[in-house]
């Protein structure tokens, strides 16, 4: 993998990652394991570039917020992320001019709370937190206070290997430390990580309303990103919440294996700043062990 130097606006610096292998099956015989080819893909991390990254970041934000993406001014939010071009990374293949396959950033909610996209996010996250017992007791009050909370936004294409994640998070921690040394507003009390999860639910075509409700209550959370399952162990509060714009019929259109549907949910993890680096180290170890 290419390297990205902390706070170097041209990208490509100090964090190494072994090239993940991407497996491609021969189209002529998809059932024959002997036709499996191993393709080494070289991923590189870059700082944000306003001339290149707007559409890629906006597309990934739309994926992150799923059906609730329509509630936000994603264009303004993308611009704000890109303006912070020394904090966070995009992950690309081959060339800086390509669209991002993944992105990671942190926004100071207190510093930017008067800006429309951040005000929308604060209102939305406060409302959604109230629907989850773990989050309701701490997050609404914290977001209404004058404490500096770092909102972590991260997303990647679903077929991206998990190995790209630890270098991105490690880079960002280094960049935050450098920014704090430069007296920039990145000294946080907490980090609020927004992600997605899902439940497998029986098709609404096959269930009465009572059975649907019971199935939703019993369905176990599954994670699109395996690192989230590890990171939540370090959170003072975490939990899933329903998207406000998604009805049960949507899950029916995404029928998965064994006649089950996929019901995406939002997911938040609130981590104390003093425990954040440990959480990042834990997901690096977890991904290294799991692969």
Curated annotation (Swiss-Prot):
Pfam families: BCCIP. Its main location: cytoplasm. The keyword Nucleotidyltransferase does not apply. It is found in: Cytoplasm; Nucleus. Belongs to the BCP1 family. Involved in nuclear export, actin cytoskeleton organization and vesicular transport. This is Protein BCP1. It comes from Chaetomium globosum (strain ATCC 6205 / CBS 148.51 / DSM 1962 / NBRC 6347 / NRRL 1970) (Soil fungus).
């Amino acid at each position: 993998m290419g390297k990205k130097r902390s706070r170097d606006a041209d990208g490509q610096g100090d964090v190494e990652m072994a090239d993940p292998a991407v497996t491609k099956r021969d189209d002529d015989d998809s059932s024959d394991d002997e036709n499996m080819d191993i393709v080494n893909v070289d991923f590189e991390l870059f700082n944000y570039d306003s001339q290149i990254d707007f559409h890629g970041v906006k597309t990934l934000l739309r994926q992150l917020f799923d059906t609730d993406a329509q509630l936000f001014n994603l264009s303004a939010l993308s611009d704000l992320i890109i303006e912070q071009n020394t904090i966070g990374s995009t992950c690309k293949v081959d060339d800086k001019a390509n669209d991002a396959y993944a992105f990671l950033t942190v926004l100071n909610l207190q510093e930017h709370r008067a800006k429309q996209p951040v005000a929308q996010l604060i209102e939305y996250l406060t409302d959604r937190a109230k629907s989850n017992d773990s989050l309701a007791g701490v997050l609404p009050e914290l977001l209404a206070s004058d404490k500096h909370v770092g909102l972590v936004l991260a997303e990647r294409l679903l077929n991206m290997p998990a190995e790209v994640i630890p270098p991105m998070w490690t880079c960002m921690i280094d960049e935050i430390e450098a920014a704090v040394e430069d007296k920039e507003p990145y000294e946080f009390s907490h980090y609020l990580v927004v992600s997605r999860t899902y439940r497998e639910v029986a098709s609404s075509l096959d269930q009465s309303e009572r059975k649907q409700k019971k199935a939703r209550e019993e369905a176990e959370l599954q994670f699109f990103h395996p690192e989230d399952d590890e990171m939540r162990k370090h959170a003072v509060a975490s939990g899933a919440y329903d998207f406000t714009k998604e009805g049960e019929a949507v899950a029916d259109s995404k029928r998965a294996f064994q006649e089950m549907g996929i019901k995406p949910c939002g997911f938040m993890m609130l981590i104390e700043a003093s425990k954040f680096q440990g959480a990042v180290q834990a997901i690096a170890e977890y991904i290294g062990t799991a692969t």
